[in-house]
Amino acid sequence: MWEGSEILSSGEGGNHDRLEGAPLRLVAWESTRACRLSCLHCRAQAQHEPHPDQLRKEEILRVIEEIASFCRPILIITGGDPLLREDIFAVSSYAQERGLRPVMSPSGSLITPEVIERMLSSGIQRISVSLDGSRAEVHDYFRQAKGCFEETLQTLEYARQGRLPFQINTTVTRHNQDDLPGIHDLVVKLGAVAWDVFMFIPTGRGIPEMAVTPEEYERIMTWIYKMSQDSPLMIKMT
């Protein structure tokens, strides 16, 4: 989840007749199903091609206009990989113009310094990138493709150089639970503003056998709590 005082602030946005007293703070838009990767645990079951019924540009602009009529939330642009939409920066620019605060969750496989510049110029305030291992063999196993670990590190370096804040998301399964201390240390080293730890839920492509046991879940929660007391990171658990 996207949180943090540097993005969220209380009292912003107005009320709507139908939602009086309860303005939205977060809106997630699954912009496309398309993605170059085939992650084992992908909730969205992303494919190489976009879904034929995904929202067209004019449709999502109307949705943004409706949202902006009663509040100014963070707009989380997810996928698939949002960067596979040619109109994605036009949409994020429009969202910013209407007072929303766009953030993006790219796959990390299409980032260049030029893309970082376009993100910034179109109003993207932060990106969220997945990192599921502190070593290539762990991270790339989840992605089912060699080289993704190095691509992710390069993406984060481009973001750091471009002064685009980034958070790192990690999905915990039985395959990487013992690597959490190493992932934490790498996240700190990379300069992330936050580390969001997601406990795996068997949905999408994820199968039940990937989940940790209840005992392991409790141990992980205890470890994360203790780690968060001294870590320089904002650590969240979902």
How should each PLM-predicted stretch be described?
Residues W2-S122, R126:
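Conserved alpha-helical substructure of the radical SAM core
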Residues M1-E3, I7-L8, P50, L55, ...:
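Radical SAM enzyme [4Fe-4S]-AdoMet core and its adjacent flexible, acidic
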